[in-house]
Amino acid sequence: MFRLRFLPMKTGAGAGASASECKTTDDLTLVAASWRNSDSMPPGSSIVTSPGLAKVLTHAELGSCDAWKHAFRNKCKDHRYYEIIEETLEDAFEYHYLLLEDDSGNARAIQPVFFVRQNLVEGVPGKMSSIVDRVRKIFPHFLTMRVLMVGCAAGTGDLAACDERDETWVANALQASLSSYARQNKASLVVLKDFPATYRLELETFPIHGYARIPSMPMTRLPLPYNNWDEYFLTLSKATRKDLRRKFRKAERPPKIEMEVVSDIAPLVDEIHPLYLAVHERSPLKFETLTKGYFRTIGRRMPDRARFFIWRQLGKIVAFSFCLVCDDKIYDECIGLDYSVALDLHLYFYTLRDIISWALEHGLKYYYSNPLNYEPKLHLDCELVPLDLYVTHTNSLLNPIFRHFLKYLGPTRHDPVLQRFPNADQL
C-alpha cells in the first residue's frame, strides 16, 4: 500500500495581508549555514509563478507574519497545531512554509509543506512485502523516495488561504510552484496528503496538470441527531446491540472504571504515553509518532479545543483518548490502551460509548474518527469521510508510467471492509 495515508483562478476575492507584514529575519546567515549540507532550498528563496510568488519561510519567520494568524483560522487544526507539530514531532520531517503572494504583493496564503523519505510499499501484504524487506537488507532505500508533502504531518490536509474565498487561487498557485520547488530540493514525488474530498473542486487543477488523485484511507463520521446514548443505541442492528451489551457487562464488573475529562494532560503524560505507544505499535500503518512533548504542549496551547478522556481502574489509568472539539464536532485523534486489561474488558468499545455520550451531553452533532479499524465502525453505523492523495512524479517523462503504477499501490485496495460502507462509492 502506498503509505501516504495514508496519508479557474479566482482573483480579487478577499486579498490577504500585505507581504510587507511578513517580515523575514534580518540575518539569515546563521540559518542558511545549517542548510548548506541539506537537500533543501535555504530560507528566503522564492519561486516565480504565473499567479505571483512563492517564498520559502522558516518556523522562526512565522512569528512576524500576520498572514500566518489568518491561515487555518476557521479550521479545527489552526496555525497553533502546525506550530506544535513542528516543535514536538521527532520523525524525520523537514518542515517549511510557502508564503503565496499575488502579483500585487498581497499574502494570500501560507501553506505548510514538509519533506520526508517515504516507503512506497508500506502496508502492502503478502509476498511483495517480504521480497522488498530482503532487498532492503542490501539496499536500504529500495522503493523509497524523497517526497515533498503538502498538508499536515499529523492529520488531514487543508488549504491555508488567509481568506477561504481564495482557496481556488491558492490551489492554482501551489500547482504552479510545487513541482519546481520539489525538483530544486531533490524530491522525486509531490503529494498533497489526505485532503478531504470537499476540496475536490478547488483542487481540480492538480489532475488537470498531471497529478493522479487516489483515495487515501478515509476517516469515519457518526452523525449524532440523538438526545443520549440509549437513543442512538436503539438505532443499531439487533446483532450489534447484543454484542455491545455483552462487552459492556464485562467492563462494568468490579472494580469500577471511572472516567475523567481534562484539557491539560501534562501532569499525566508519563502514564498515558506508553498506552499510546502500545496501540501505535500494533497499527499496520505508521506515519508520525506522537511524542510526550506533543501531548504536553497541545493541551496548554489549545485548551479551547483539546480534550483528554481518561479511564481509571483502581486508580490506574487503563485507557485514554485525545480529542479535539470544534464547533459542533468532536474529532477522536488517538487512543491509548493498557493491553493487560484492554482486550478482556473490551475497552475500545467502552471508551467509545463514553465519548459519544459526552458529546451528546454537550450538544455536539458529529463524531469523527481517524482512519483504520473499520469493522467496528461499520457496525456502529459510521459513514466514510473520503480523503484524497494527489500525487505526481517530478520527472515529466516518468510521470505517466508512475501514474499507471499508482493504482496498484492505492491504500484502500487492501481493506475489503471499506467496500461494505454505504457511501464507499464516494472514495
Segments predicted by a language model, with ranges:
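Short C-terminal domain-edge/linker segments immediately following a structured domain
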Residues: D91, S129-I131, F139-V147, R221-P225, ...
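Active-site/acyl-donor-binding loops of N-acyltransferases
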Residues: F2-K10, C22-P51, F115-N119, T156, ...
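Intrinsically disordered, low-complexity segments enriched in serine/proline and basic residues
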Residues: G14-S18
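Hydrophobic alpha-helix feature that most strongly marks membrane-spanning transmembrane helices
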Residues: L277-P284, G299-P303, K316, F322-C323, ...
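Acyl-donor binding region in acyl/amide transferases
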Residues: E94-Y95, D102, R108, F115-R213, ...
